A protein has these predicted regions:
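Intrinsically disordered, low-complexity N-terminal segments that are enriched in acidic
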Residues: 29-252
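Bacterial N-terminal signal peptides
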Residues: 11-21
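Hydrophobic/aromatic-rich core segments of domains that either
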Residues: 335-342, 347, 352-438
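Bacterial N-terminal signal peptides that target proteins for export
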Residues: 2-12
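Extracytoplasmic
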Residues: 485-638
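Bacterial Sec-dependent signal peptides at the C-terminal "C-region" and cleavage site
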Residues: 20-30
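Long, compositionally biased intrinsically disordered regions
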Residues: 100-104, 409-521
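Secondary-structure boundary elements
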Residues: 168-344, 355
Length: 638
């Protein structure tokens, strides 16, 4: 096989597809091609010459596989890719078919065919991988390979369009093309969105000018991931009333926002361990920066247990389960002055809005996440230290991530976790790029060429050696429902004497911690006690489950009228509490302010207390929305 015949023509016609990195976030409409000036034409010729020289050098340097052996490998790869697609299609068909028996029979046949294809591929794949092992495990050719990938994905024309803008832009590209380590970081992280490497380099440079901290460790990786992802601007989703707000996210400000949050200890502890590739899917959201800050503050105040849970599958994103009502009937009440995500937790939504909110709250705390649509339903996937997990959807195999089979995305993420070995996969992909192959995301895509097949079989070997564990989907049964059918175990919470101490000041003011209940004395499905970011503990009264009263028993030294106010956090308007003081026959209505996730106090109401023992009994009229309570203040009425 003559591997160089079609190289140059392919390169000059179009950029190689850049797979899972492109079209991740909402992008503006692509601008028309920029005409090249005379200087731009010379630059294009210069970059094309660089690319051609690298293609020739790499084609010569790549190890050769004997023709018959290569043909056998390709035949096995093509058969497995076709069988994988057929198996997936048969699985999906069973869900749609009216003739379930026939569909099940076809599904079983497809699985048998896939098993045969897998078995038939083992020998040719192992033989080829063994021969190519010295190349795959060596970084000797990396500098040339990564430079070629940058030139190929950006295209000489695209680079020239950027460089012709001025000496500064041309110098930035020269600096990038001379920095093998930086180019390698970029292409290992799946390259610049839209192949816009010049724009990515500009953003990265601007970030480093704006912050001296964006040069080391996680902050350098986050700066680079942000630069790559925002090379094609991300459309910003503003409050409807904010007609003067920027239309796209400012990537430098986005970086600085996360830098500040990280240094303040506001992000997830796992953030510091993210790769450049992971970081792309943290800072790529459509929300304004102030909305990210709101997301963190809201959850700290309103539902801190979602931050504190050890279960990474549900950390942060459990807010969808507990507080984003399923149904679109209230969306007419969205407020133009509120941000999109503030409206979602207030008025709810069907699968799309719930998945949007889930991804938003994960990004707010620095957790990588992506959309994962499946037929007729919107779900999400997100990072955990143990691997990526699906929320609110069916198991792996039923959806797509960035337009590719979710199982292909899963395999790629599992291989990426083996950081030392994963470059072996990439070297094979880079070799394929050098020889004009289209990148294949996985076996769920059509076979594209010899080297991409090598990459996929190497990836599989890495996954098997690592004994990677696939995390099961969670929240499948609440994807289109309000309450789970799974029985929830409510964990017992220890409330210390200090946390439930009722304090009477010298001025007669009494402060009752929300967790100082005489009934209930432990968390229930409706009433949860949890640690508070204000110190001590707080209560959350859930929107789900049956109504449940709660009481406080305390002593008062002087009888009389007292002004009662409650410190609350709400994410929906029109919240109310009803309080019975001692033996009162009728409750007093307490209106809770719409705090949009902040702490605030209710307008005071008067209650009559007796000297000695008193009981305040609170209840709510269902249906209700969630309500966080920190404490109650009773002030003597003069």
């Amino acid at each position: 096989m003559n591997q160089r015949n079609t190289i140059i023509t392919v390169r000059l016609l179009a950029a190689i597809a850049i797979g899972l990195s492109s079209a991740i976030a909402a992008k503006p409409e692509q601008a028309a091609a920029v005409p090249l000036t005379e200087a731009g034409q010379k630059l294009e010729a210069k970059y094309a010459a660089m690319l051609k020289a690298l293609e020739e050098e790499i084609a010569t340097a790549l190890p050769k596989i004997e023709g018959a052996q290569q043909a056998a490998f390709l035949k096995a790869y093509e058969a497995e890719a076709a069988a994988t697609t057929a198996d997936r299609n048969a699985m999906h068909a069973q869900n749609k078919s009216k003739d379930k028996a026939e569909a099940a029979k076809a599904g079983a046949s497809a699985k048998e065919a896939l098993a045969r294809a897998l078995a038939n591929a083992q020998a040719p794949a192992q033989a080829v991988l063994a021969q190519l092992n010295p190349f795959l495990t060596s970084d000797k050719l990396d500098a040339q390979l990564v430079k070629l990938v940058v030139l190929a994905e950006a295209t000489p024309r695209g680079l020239a369009e950027f460089a012709q803008q001025g000496k500064e832009q041309e110098a930035l590209l020269e600096k990038l093309l001379a920095d093998a380590d930086l180019m390698k970081q970029m292409v290992v992280a799946a390259g610049a969105s839209g192949g816009k490497y010049g724009q990515a380099m500009q953003i990265f440079t601007d970030i480093q000018k704006a912050s001296s901290r964006g040069k080391d460790d996680i902050l350098q990786r986050f700066a680079l991931g942000t630069s790559l992802e925002h090379a094609v601007p991300v459309v910003q989703r503003n409050a409807v009333a904010r007609t003067d707000a920027p239309t796209t996210v400012d990537p430098v400000k986005r970086y600085l926002h996360y830098e500040k949050a990280y240094l303040a200890g506001e992000l997830d502890p796992g953030f510091k361990d993210l790769s450049v590739w992971d970081c792309r899917f943290v800072g790529n959201g459509d929300e304004p920066d102030e909305m990210l800050a709101w997301g963190r503050e809201m959850l700290r105040n309103y539902h801190p247990d979602h931050i504190q849970t050890a279960d990474y599958r549900w950390r942060y994103v459990e807010a969808v389960k507990t507080d984003v009502k399923y149904g679109s009937q209230d969306q007419k009440n969205d407020l133009p002055t509120l941000g999109f995500y503030q409206n979602i937790i207030n008025t709810g939504g069907v699968c799309g809005r719930r998945a949007f909110f889930g991804r938003f709250i994960l990004r707010s705390f620095g957790i990588p996440t992506l959309a994962r649509p499946q037929p007729g339903h919107a779900t999400l996937v997100h990072w955990t230290p143990a691997g990526w997990v699906i929320n609110l959807g069916a198991s792996w195999g039923w959806g797509t991530v960035v337009g590719e089979a979710d199982t292909d995305f899963l395999a790629m993420t599992q291989a990426r976790m083996a950081e030392a070995a994963y470059p072996e996969v990439l070297r094979a992909q880079w070799a394929g790029t050098a020889l004009g192959e289209k990148k294949a995301a996985g076996f769920g895509a059509a076979a594209t060429g010899f080297w991409n097949g090598v990459a996929l079989y190497r990836q599989r070997a890495i996954i098997e050696k690592a004994k990677a564990v696939t995390l099961a989907a969670v929240g499948t049964d609440i994807g289109e429902a309000n309450e789970s059918k799974e029985k929830e175990v409510v964990k017992s919470v220890t409330v210390s004497e200090a946390d439930k101490k009722i304090v009477a000041g010298p001025d007669g003011v009494i402060t009752i911690p929300a967790v100082a209940c005489s009934k209930p004395t432990d968390s229930t499905p409706k009433i949860r006690f949890m640690k508070s970011y204000l110190g001590g503990m707080q209560m959350h009264y859930s929107r789900m489950g049956n109504a449940e009263p709660f009481e406080y028993t305390f002593d008062v030294s002087a009888a009389g009228k007292y002004s009662l106010s409650v410190r609350v956090a709400t994410v929906s308007p029109d919240q109310r509490l009803l309080v019975f003081a001692n033996e009162a026959k009728e409750p007093i209505d307490i209106a809770a302010p719409y705090t949009i996730g902040k702490w605030d106090k209710t307008p005071p109401v008067e209650v009559a207390l007796v000297k000695g023992k008193n009981v305040l009994r609170f209840t709510r009229n269902e249906p209700v929305k969630g309500l966080a309570i920190k404490d109650f203040t009773l002030t003597p009425v003069k």
